Amino acid sequence: MSIPSIVYKAHATGNDFVVYLDAEGTYEPTADEVRFLCDRHFGIGGDGLIRLTHPQAVSDLNDKQIAVCAADNADWFMDYRNADGSLAEMCGNGTRAITLFAQRQGIAGQPGGEPFRLGTRAGVKVLTSLGDVPTLGKDVFQVEMGSWKRGDLDGYEVTIPGTAGSARGTFVDMGNPHVVAVIEDAFSSLPTVEQLDLVTKPVVAPRIESDQNVEFVRIDEQSEGDNEGNAKIGRAHV
C-alpha cells in the first residue's frame, strides 16, 4: 500500500477524516486505498482522507499552483480526497481538523502563536488557533476562507432518489462547490428537514461535472430590515 503504517482519525464538528503526515512525500494514496480506509464497515471510516504533505509532493498540482503556495509561504498542503477516492479542492471543516493534527505534530503554531498557512487546491487558507473558547468549545480555529461566489438563484433542481418531491438549489463557490436548497417553502415539495433522507446521495440537475456538496436549509425567521434569517441546516456530503 502507498500509505504509512500509522494513520489517525480526526473530526471538526462531526465531519470526520482519516489523516496522516507525509513529510517526505512518499505516501500519495490511490483511489482504491482512499475508498478502503474511508469505508465505515471494512476500513477506518471517514467522510474523506487528508494527507498533510508539501505542495511539491502532490502529483496533480501544476507549477502555477505550487508557485502560489510558495509565494504565500504555505510550506504544507492539504491533499484532500473524498471518501469515493476522487480529488477535492478542499473542505472547510477539514482545514481545521488537519491544522489541529499539524499542531499535535509540532508543525503548526499553538494557541496565540503565528497563523498556519495551509495550501489547498482552492488556494492558501490561513488558520489562527484560538485554543479553548468557553462559548464555542475546545480547539477552536479562525479560518480565512477567502472570497465566495454565488451562481444563478435557484438555478438547479435537487432531488433525493427514493424520496418524492424536489427543491430549487443555488450554486455557491466556497473554494469548493456547493448547492444550497431551501426546503419547506413554496418552491419545494421535499419533506421537512427532520424527515429528509440524508443517507442517499442527492441528485443535482443540471449535473455539475466536479460534483458538489448539497445543503438543505429551512428559513425559520426573517428580519424585514436586513433579509437575514435563522436557518436549521441538514448537511449531506456528496
Predicted regions located by residue number:
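Active-site-proximal beta-strand elements of phosphoester/diester hydrolases
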Residues: Q142-E144, G169-F171, G234
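Short, surface-exposed, charge-dense and proline/glycine-enriched linear segments
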Residues: D84-S86, N93, S147-L153, G175
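Active-site glycine-rich loop that binds ribose-phosphate moieties when present
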Residues: S147-G169, D197-L198
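Internal active-site segments that recognize and position negatively charged phosphoryl groups
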Residues: I160-P191
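Membrane helix-loop-helix hairpins that form the core translocation module of multi-pass transporters
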Residues: L136-W148
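A glycine-rich beta-to-alpha transition motif near the start of alpha/beta enzyme domains, typified by
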Residues: M1-G137, V180-R235
